Design a protein with these regions (language model features):
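Glycine-rich phosphate-binding loops of nucleotide-dependent enzymes
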Residues: 1-164
Length: 164
């Protein structure tokens, strides 16, 4: 997250490699430059609207609540049009309402954008609520794998992560 930049500029950063200009276009702000910049603004705003952030597009990213900052990070990542999105403990530091919103956001990412999400997370409610298949590691070793129902009822997983 670029905390000193405004929200829309954070998403535009993810779009930078998709739009190219010639030296003359960027130097003299020729019509094609303005057209490409407008396209980038429109695409950034479209991504922000998907995540309910269009109303804060001109706010500094640092001024957003923590949950919205996470959504912004995901929107910026999606601007690069990935096939795989790796989220490393995205719910860390979130309150239950923010975690619920994050679950909805991840579902949008999977369904609307067709992106595979690889999630590293300790929040079992989040994991069981959105994951289709789990791999559970304990001290770097595979402890269990399977559907959330299978894994979360595995006695070894319960002992290691949920307590006996």
């Amino acid at each position: 997250l670029f905390s000193v930049r405004i929200v829309v500029d954070n998403v535009r950063t993810g779009l930078d490699d998709q739009i190219t200009y010639s030296f003359a276009e960027s130097m003299f702000h020729l019509g094609s430059y303005r057209k490409k910049e407008k396209q980038m603004d429109e695409k950034a705003m479209e991504l922000l609207s998907v995540f309910g952030l269009e109303s804060v597009a001109d706010y500094r990213a640092a001024n957003l609540p923590y949950g919205k900052q996470r959504k912004l990070e995901i929107a910026r990542a999606l601007a690069t049009e990935p096939k795989l999105l790796l989220l490393d403990e995205p719910a860390a530091g979130m309150n239950p309402n923010e975690t619920e919103e994050l679950m909805e956001t991840i579902e949008v990412v999977r369904k609307r954008f067709g992106v595979t999400v690889l999630l590293i997370e300790h929040d079992m409610k989040l994991v069981s609520g959105i994951c289709e298949y789990l791999y559970v590691l304990n001290f770097g070793r595979l402890l269990a794998e399977g559907t959330p129902k299978e894994v979360l009822s595995n006695p070894e997983v319960v002992k290691a992560y949920l307590g006996e």
